[in-house]
Amino acid sequence: MYSNKKRQAILLALLAAHCTFYGTNVTAAPVPVTDGKYTADGTDTYDPITHTDTINSIKVSNGAQVSVTAGATTVNGVNSSESLTASSGGQLTVNGSLNATVGLGDTYSTGVGYSGIVANGSGSKIILSGTDNSITSKSTNYKNSESAFFAYNNGEIHVTGDTTTVKVSQSRIVAAQDGASITFSNG
């Protein structure tokens, strides 16, 4: 029979192995996000990313796939461009309810517009499927097509949860161009 310490060592080794190989095509263990910015590149699949603290932004690109499965996700992206971003074939899915403040203040003098939730490029997708989403856009540069949701270059944004509340100041709610699509199929 194994001693208690030996049993604990075996269990910890098994747990570590499970974490290392969790998911599909994973080259690194799933990464818990607790603060700041999360950036996913390459072909890694991180599923799930669970966290309880506020995130400044999530940017997914180059075919990476990120699934956020926490019960509630809070994103405070004020004064950061493209707080939730999928580009170059990246896919971001938020399964839990999303409470996000996104966008940048007035940048018209610089000729630069910043939207909040952005999908750019063919195969790039953002899917919000939480039951109660609340999006507040702080963008104020209406003339540069700033919006709470912005899809372009064949990017896709799909909102499929039960209820989504969007508040804007001077920006658009949605903007899509160059073959992109934004769909709201929630109740």
Region locations from a protein language model:
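Gram-negative bacterial Sec-dependent N-terminal signal peptides
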Residues: 1-27
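Generic detector of low-complexity/intrinsically disordered segments
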Residues: 13-17, 23, 86, 94, ...
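Short hydrophobic transmembrane-like helices used for membrane targeting/insertion
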Residues: 26, 126-127, 173, 182
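Extracellular beta-strand/beta-solenoid scaffold signature
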Residues: 29, 35-37, 52-60, 76-88, ...
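Glycine-rich repeat segments that build the extracellular carbohydrate-interaction surface of secreted
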Residues: 32, 38-49, 60, 67-69
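Small-residue (G/S/T/A) turn/hinge positions that recur once per unit in extracellular repeat modules
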Residues: 42-43, 63-66, 71-72, 90, ...
